[in-house]
Amino acid sequence: MLILLTNDDGIASPGLQALKDALKERHDVVTLAPVKDMSGTAHAISRGEDIKLTRIAEYEVAINGTPTDCVMAGLRMVLRRPPDLLVSGINMGANVAEDLSYSATAGAAWEGALSGIPSMAVSLCGSAAPWHFESAIKVTHMVIRQWLENPLPPGTFLNVNVPNVPEYELKNPKPTRQGLRFNWPPPPVTAAGNPAFWDPTIPTPREEEFQLATDEEALRDGFTSVTALHCLFRHPHATERLKAWSLFR
């Protein structure tokens, strides 16, 4: 199987290199990744700039652009045929809830799905070493095997978040939904009534009631989270309700 591998932490990221080495044992892997850390660039592309491709090694290319640029270059310039799978990761840090709006790890998988390629984003959910890449690699192999046996609908991409624990401590993955994690508190104000500062790292929990656990809830309970997403911004239920508006009569 031919796999296109990318990430948003950059070509030198140990997470990317560990996953590349592991996937190469079972598959043909072509790696295109940013020259530098491009975390938080979401689904952005570079406009008005020349994109330079630098060959680092055989089947490994660094690009002075975003992860989405990497996917586009891989599909349109580097690969001779479409890959069977696109994998973005291993990201060093969680990508859950509204993180997905900003995550370039997920953005690369999103671009793959838009191009008709089964795609997945893989994140190892910790904040400091030691990084247990072997755990994320094990889950990645498991998800790939299941996807081959039970293909998902076109346009689907998966967001996989693995607890940063040793492989022997891993629990079975859980299917999850994207959560909505935070209510942002109002910033403190000065005596003149102006906002003093804004700190997006100080949230308050938002309570929700749904049958399927959220991605963050699964992680909090020590499980790997696997969330199926669609590459198109569409909401069938809302569209049906929209049809009832008098605006369209």
UniProtKB/Swiss-Prot annotation:
Main location: cytoplasm
A Pfam family per the record: SurE
Database matches in Gene3D superfamilies: Survival protein SurE-like phosphatase/nucleotidase
Cofactor, how bound (note): Binds 1 divalent metal cation per subunit.
UniProt xrefs under InterPro entries: SurE, SurE-like_Pase/nucleotidase, SurE-like_sf
Reactions catalysed according to its record: a ribonucleoside 5'-phosphate + H2O = a ribonucleoside + phosphate
Record's keyword annotation contains Phosphoprotein: no
UniProt KW keywords: Cytoplasm, Hydrolase, Metal-binding, Nucleotide-binding
EC numbers for this chain: 3.1.3.5
GO molecular function, one term: 3'-nucleotidase activity
Family stated for the protein in its record: Belongs to the SurE nucleotidase family.
Entries under PANTHER family matching the protein: 5'-NUCLEOTIDASE SURE, 5'_3'-NUCLEOTIDASE SURE
Function: Nucleotidase that shows phosphatase activity on nucleoside 5'-monophosphates.
Name of protein: 5'-nucleotidase SurE
Gene symbol of the encoding locus: surE
